[in-house]
Amino acid sequence: MAAPISLKWEEHSLHENKFVRDEDERPKVPYNTFSNEIPVISLAGIDGCRRAEICDEIVKACEDWGIFQVVDHGVDTKLLSDMTGLARDFFHLPTQEKLRFDMTGGKKGGFIVSSHLQGEAVQDWREIVTYFSYPIKARDYSRWPDKPNEWRAVTEEYSKVLMGLACKLLEVLSEAMGLEKEALTKACVDMDQKVVVNYYPKCPQPDLTLGLKRHTDPGTITLLLQDQVGGLQATRDGGESWITVKPVEGAFVVNLGDHGHYLSNGRFKNADHQAVVNSSTSRLSIATFQNPAPEAIVYPLKINEGEKSIMEEPMTFMEMYKKKMSTDLELARLKKLAKDKQQDLEVVKPIQNIFA
């Protein structure tokens, strides 16, 4: 299915509406019914007397949810304000301006409307602009927007500062696993960083769709900066129940990804989450994905006595990623087959009744 150039809700037929989710995938909790279950952790004193206390708080959050929020993280509030302001300015540009950086057709970085795996029938209600920032040699500035004018300078600084914060958090997680503090960073080899800016416009029927479908991130950790609207949701029971993460001004939401989950031998959860939308206001979030290099080996860094590895054998991160994508595609294919079969049965039943 080709990506659209703008988000348009088809009112006349929900069957033809490419944004309508199956009933079991639709939001169960409102975007603004906030939960306090996700801990908010102050990083003040992380390099001093509070390090052990902070480590304990992060460990508990990773074991319970794979998600926590951090404040007092040292990232300048002006940088956060500049980054979010420029992001909103970009999405308010005319469509043709944004489409100059269209990333369909396999282009690495740029702008796209909606998102979905190739082969999936349903799309997400969002626009995104993304760029690859680390390793520096992989940057392709031709794919970075040139409007607003300050975009490149601010996003470069933002990427650098968040790389530093991510490495600091990985040190704490390494120590929590009983390893040297550089262990997780070393396991990433030459750490990748990808920044995805999400814009979720108002939606006419938000109860039928998602801004971003349920998933876990493939990488090590993700740092999410979100506005105060609300819409990030998490589950820890396989999707039976959901909570909406309460936005905290200036905080980063930290999600543990699949790579971090495997390196911890399953001790730390990979955050199971989604984004919902609403009919009242747009929402903005900026996700910074910290991923291992494609050739990095994925396998538990420490297996305690009496435990077994949750992985059958080591694999590269690229192999892990491809396996994850193929599994997701196969699940989507099987679900679509079941849905099509059910629709066929619903057509046949009335015909059978006529001749009964």
From Swiss-Prot:
Write out the pathway annotation from the protein's UniProt entry. Secondary metabolite biosynthesis; flavonoid biosynthesis
Record keywords:
Dioxygenase, Flavonoid biosynthesis, Iron, Metal-binding, Oxidoreductase, Vitamin C
| Cofactor(s) this protein cannot do without | Fe(2+); L-ascorbate
Q: Spell out the InterPro entries in the cross-references.
A: DIOX_N, IPNS-like_FE2OG_OXY, IPNS-like_sf, Oxoglu/Fe-dep_dioxygenase_dom, Plant_2OG-oxidoreductases
Q: Which reaction does it catalyse?
A: a (2S)-flavan-4-one + 2-oxoglutarate + O2 = a (2R,3R)-dihydroflavonol + succinate + CO2
Positions with a binding annotation for Fe cation: 215, 217, 273
GO biological process terms held by the UniProt record: flavonoid biosynthetic process
State the family named in the UniProt similarity comment for this chain.
Belongs to the iron/ascorbate-dependent oxidoreductase family.
What protein does this entry describe? Answer: Naringenin,2-oxoglutarate 3-dioxygenase
* Organism this protein belongs to: Callistephus chinensis (China aster)
Lineage, broadest ranks:
Eukaryota, Viridiplantae, Streptophyta, Embryophyta, Tracheophyta
Q: Which gene encodes it?
A: FHT
